[in-house]
Amino acid sequence: MRWIKVMAGLLPMIGSKGADEKDSSQQRRLSRVVVPEHYDLHVKILDAGFCGSVGIRVMISQDVSEIVLNAKELEIRDAGIVVEGARIPGRVVVGEAEKELEVVRIVFPSSLRAGPGYLTMEFCGDYSNGLVGLYKSGGPKEVYSTHFEPTDARRAFPCFDQPDMKATFKISIDAGSKFTVLANTQAIPSLREEYGDRKIEYFEETCKMSTYLVAFVVGELSYIEDWSKDGVRLRVYGDSSEVEWGRYGLEVGKRCLEYFSEYFGVGYEFPRAGSAKIDMVGIPNFSSGAMENWGLITFRRESLLYVPGKSNVEDMKNVAGTVCHELGHMWFGNLVTMSWWDDLWLNEGFATWVSFKGMENIGSVVSWDVWGEFVLWNVVRGMVDDGLGKSHQIRMNVTDPGEIGEIFDSISYCKGASVIRMIERYVGESVFMLGIRRYIKEHMYGNGNAMSLWKAIGEEYGEDISEMVEGWISQAGYPVVSVQDCGSSLVLSQSRYSMLGKSDDSLWTIPVVVSWEGKGQERIELRGRETTVRKRSSVYKVNAEYGGFYRVLYDSAGLSGLESRIDSLSVVDRVNVIEDVFGLGFGLYGGLEHGLRRISEYYSDSYHVARSGIEKLLRLRSVFYDDAEIVSLIDKKVRKMILPCVGRIDVFDIGTSVESVSMNKYVLSVGVEVGIREAVEKVQELWRRHVEAGEELGELRWIVYKAVVDENLGYMMDKYKNGDTPGMRREVMNGFSGIKREENFLDVVGNLSQFSVEDIGVVIGSISRGGAFRDAMVEYVVSHGEELYLMVHKNAMLYNMIIMSLRHVSGDLIVEKVERFLSGIKHSGSNLSIEKVRNEIQWRRRMRGIREEVLRGLLPEAEK
């Protein structure tokens, strides 16, 4: 989810060609001369592959001599169309041009007249190796499952595979009798056919939906279930040995579904009231976190299953966030679908934002600072990635599948969600909610776009907001708002922020919210290059509650006032100050030396504040990883900041709340990283007790693994393969960042094929971040690039994870090797990742050019 140059003169705008239609357009989208209305899809699951048949009720709007639809890596035969009761055979054409464009042509002996028809064909295919299309997961018990977003339904059956060609589906699956068979809708027991050791399950007809949401799963599965107050059946499916671990996800799902039904003003009724259901299934091998197939959500196991007493708080947050994200899609994405993939951000950004809305409103099952998490993992991440040179706009014009897969990134998700939050905070929660309800009711079971959404919100707000919002989604980057304190007034001005010193003439309509000490908040629209605001108090904060997606550059008076009140700021406002000071310092806008001197004053024992501050120092440490003096000074500063907290930590009782556990874990992990003896000794004592007396490592598992990996690599590999919790594999891989022995490094990278295909990039990324073998890991990747591409079965998203591991280097020789490697990549779907790596490396080298400023900020006053 996360490939084609058009051969000039060979193919028109892909679609069903009328008799007089010319090959003039070279777009990849199917034409709408023929559109689907309904599919009868039958699939037979076999050991070595699959086969099936599809009948598609279509509407033809003008006379055509052929019908073109999508298919990839399928053998298609016996195609034809029934028109007015007579079947007309068609010739299947799949040449090199069609393969390149992932289509099949059904050519008829004479023109078909405009009107209805029933297109039929049979097909066979092999299971995909790349975790897309219809594929088979390994493990003790094999599971056959689908993953179609964005454009992989065509790997499983011939179809009109684009989001604006919605249709209804009747699905039937032929599989072994021992298997549970699931699809988007409920099975109809009275229609089940059994023969020999096999059965055919028939499923209720779906509502109109896009092909990427079609799904089916076949495997030996057990389930647990619950019902929402509106009568929706929710189930978690998994292996019988672990399905009980789905209780937490099931409870989150039920509560979130009930909240969303109320928030959106439309109940969940897929496919219809009385038979509505949501199945959530943990899949053994899965490329992303989850997939929002309507009525049948598929998950990576650790994103759905939580083991009380053994899983950690990160697992809990991951399960809650992922379940709420996918349920948000049931309305935003499924009920109303973007017309084309250029509005993908509307699906993913909205689902990301609304998942936090859901977590905030479902009671005690979520007991952490939801919006503090949102700021750290969405606003901060989105700003870092969007501030690095050649980013891309939120709404990005895409045509081929490779481009579509690339925009499942932090811009679509994190920046998209942050912009939505900014709009909601500006127009108000209730107005925004009413606008969302209006949008959904106007476009139910159809397609929408961003302009339709802004129109609906504007009608509730009483003012057109489209002009304000369009700048945020149609141009890359974001602004820095400079604040000049003129005594009785403030002058606010804007320019584009860049970490690479590449500004331009971009302008945004910025919904600025200023918090005045003792005077409340004021909303201001900064439309042009600058505006003047009457000053209401001497202390103020621009971008109240970190609600806007922009940085703020204060002059000395403004920043001094904020720093004098730093302890009274909310968590997100305090994080905002840290992020702005260092974000601007990292962009060479000035103030980095000041920020480094004051970082200890910005710091607090709040998890989100502490993490924000320390991460800035660790990011600098990563830039200067081969500079012993800088690394030593950063470690010294970090040790001084966190030592009191480390001293209070009891590794056998790590905390009583999610906040305290998160804080203590983070500080302890950093303490081990920067060599605090007490932190190392505490972790080693926990490991000793684990080995000698079976003490559970619990929340500290990955931190312990990182500390002891060199002496216990075999143990960790066993835990990777036979872990006690679904999340343990991730903890083992995180622990690889602690490898310091060359023989262990060579053992891991020399045997990457022993890891699941979706984990190979994670392992490489962990080692490349670790420091000891950063350059060596990068050397390995650039020397084995093609081998790694084949190892992940040419899955662009998984290969891009490997490419992104190259961004952590700065030295001249290794950077030259990385650039040669990047220049030689010819695989489609990696252009954005390549640019991100280049931009990150360019920024790192730019930062190394201000070493003296960094040194001045780190040195104690007496040593300057």
From Swiss-Prot:
The keyword Calcium does not apply. InterPro entries: Aminopeptidase_N-like_N, Aminopeptidase_N-like_N_sf, ERAP1-like_C_dom, M1_APN-typ, Peptidase_M1, Peptidase_M1_aminopeptidases, Peptidase_M1_dom, Peptidase_M4/M1_CTD_sf. Zn(2+) binds at residues 325, 329, 348. Its cofactor is Zn(2+). Its EC number is 3.4.11.-. One of its GO terms (biological process) is proteolysis. The active site is at residue 326. This is Probable M1 family aminopeptidase 1. It comes from Encephalitozoon cuniculi (strain GB-M1) (Microsporidian parasite). The lineage of its organism: Eukaryota, Fungi, Fungi incertae sedis, Microsporidia, Unikaryonidae.
